[in-house]
Amino acid sequence: MEILMTVSKFASICTMGANASALEKEIGPEQFPVNEHYFGLVNFGNTCYCNSVLQALYFCRPFREKVLAYKSQPRKKENLLTCLADLFHSIATQKKKVGVIPPKKFITRLRKENELFDNYMQQDAHEFLNYLLNTIADILQEERKQEKQNGRLRNGDVDNEDNNSTPDPTWVHEIFQGTLTNETRCLTCETISSKDEDFLDLSVDVEQNTSITHCLRGFSNTETLCSEYKYYCEECRSKQEAHKRMKVKKLPLILALHLKRFKYMDQLHRYTKLSYRVVFPLELRLFNTSGDATNPDRMYDLVAVVVHCGSGPNRGHYIAIVKSHDFWLLFDDDIVEKIDAQAIEEFYGLTSDISKNSESGYILFYQSRD
């Protein structure tokens, strides 16, 4: 058995090496970007949800640069961010241009910190992205808080900071955070009230044979509040019919869009996949911005896509397609392949109905040009 396993591992390593050398030849030494590395990630038992998101984030350059800068800071106690920084640094400093890396330390830490991921079952890539970004932000805010406290103690200032004060935004917020404004207009007095809400990613409903632009417009459709759903107007001091709509007030540097492809079906008593064909362009501009939005004409370029392959949330596989310099790559755990830009169309989804086995875009990462 031991010999068989060793032979199997050796065969696997040989295959990885063959894939790596083929990719290097396909790109060519003259075209290969300086200081760039393309490394697949070993799957530790249904960890493709994690691998695909990590590859997408690695090729979101502002995020990668901040994580690598964090690595260069004085050594800190191990946490999820230090493990991520070690992984990114390991990829970025490899002598080889292409290859495979086992993200074992990161996966071990992830499973230790959150029981949701402490198993060998398929997890949701969007849940993982959400958890990762929020955890990193929490770590950075806690470290900043500790630094302030240590600074005050050194200066002899023992007064505690107001615990209710809003924490300063971190570089996670600077990169991914946008702001939505919820506008409600009373149909009696025409008074408009608005409430702001921050987001790190936007979850949008999907419809058959549409585009991401259409889905985003639907996200901002006007909703009429009437009957038992009437809105309490402060001006009228009574419940009134009203129009409500959501607009984008602040556009993020990197816009992460989550396509809501998993829907609970009452008759089936389970979630099923909406394999609808949703076109996502290489260039994107948002049209549902508020009147007071900063830089409302901001243009975005698609830099990465997390793709779900399969027919349901608990069955299937995740891969990532990323843009690096002027070409596109597909990361399927330890396999890395160069693909044509036209091949992205294969990941839009299917024109047929639900519950189909499909490879469809699930999380889109758009980076601002400015």
Swiss-Prot record:
Region (Disordered) location: 146-168
Family matches, as CDD domains: Peptidase_C19G
Any single GO CC term annotated in Swiss-Prot or TrEMBL for this entry: nucleus
Keyword tags: Cell membrane, Cytoplasm, Hydrolase, Membrane, Metal-binding, Nucleus, Protease, Thiol protease, Ubl conjugation pathway, Zinc
Compartments (UniProt record): Nucleus; Cytoplasm; Cell membrane
Broad class of where this protein is predominantly found: nucleus
Catalytic activity: Thiol-dependent hydrolysis of ester, thioester, amide, peptide and isopeptide bonds formed by the C-terminal Gly of ubiquitin (a 76-residue protein attached to proteins as an intracellular targeting signal)
Annotated control of activity: Activated by interaction with WDR20; WDR48 and DMWD through different allosteric mechanisms.
SUPFAM superfamilies found in the cross-reference section: Cysteine proteinases
Record flagged with keyword Metal-binding: yes
Role: Deubiquitinating enzyme that plays various roles in the regulation of the immune response and inflammation. During TCR engagement and activation, translocates into the cytoplasm and deubiquitinates its substrates LAT and TRAT1 and prevents their lysosome-dependent degradation to stabilize the TCR signaling complex at the plasma membrane. Plays an essential role in the selective LPS-induced macrophage response through the activation of NF-kappa-B pathway. In addition, promotes that antiviral immune response through targeting DNA sensor IFI16 to inhibit its proteasome-dependent degradation.
Self-association and partners: Interacts with WDR48. Interacts with WDR20; this interaction promotes translocation of the USP12 complex to the plasma membrane. Component of the USP12/WDR20/WDR48 deubiquitinating complex. Component of the USP12/DMWD/WDR48 deubiquitinating complex. Interacts with PHLPP1. Interacts with RBPJ. Interacts with CBP; this interaction blocks the acetyltransferase activity of CREBBP.
The family this protein is said to belong to: Belongs to the peptidase C19 family. USP12/USP46 subfamily.
Protein name: Ubiquitin carboxyl-terminal hydrolase 12
Gene: Usp12
